[in-house]
């Protein structure tokens, strides 16, 4: 499956997917996040991953299991990291 035509977007998305076997990302979540991103648009990349992580954190507050919340926090942390990948140190 190819998410993006832009090589760097595709590579970074695949890097997020590398964490799936260890619970650090979820295919369905990544696919939904990628649908919100305009290919080649760095601002869209940032907001897509950031919003996906924030939605996951909000949803995790309803989980009764601490373990499930912990798994969600792990995935959200990876999505936040992905959101910031293309940011310039000069961005505010």
Region roles according to the model:
Residues 1-92:
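N-terminal targeting or regulatory segments adjacent to alpha/beta-hydrolase or S9 domains
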């Amino acid at each position: 499956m190819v998410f993006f035509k832009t090589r760097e977007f595709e590579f970074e998305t695949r890097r997020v997917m590398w964490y799936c076997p260890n619970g650090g990302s979820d295919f369905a979540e990544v696919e939904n996040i990628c649908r919100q991103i305009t290919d080649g648009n760095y601002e869209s990349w940032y907001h897509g991953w950031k919003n996906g992580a924030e939605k996951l954190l909000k949803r995790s507050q309803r989980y009764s299991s601490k373990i499930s919340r912990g798994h969600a926090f792990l995935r959200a942390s990876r999505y936040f990291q992905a959101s910031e990948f293309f940011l310039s140190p000069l961005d505010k």
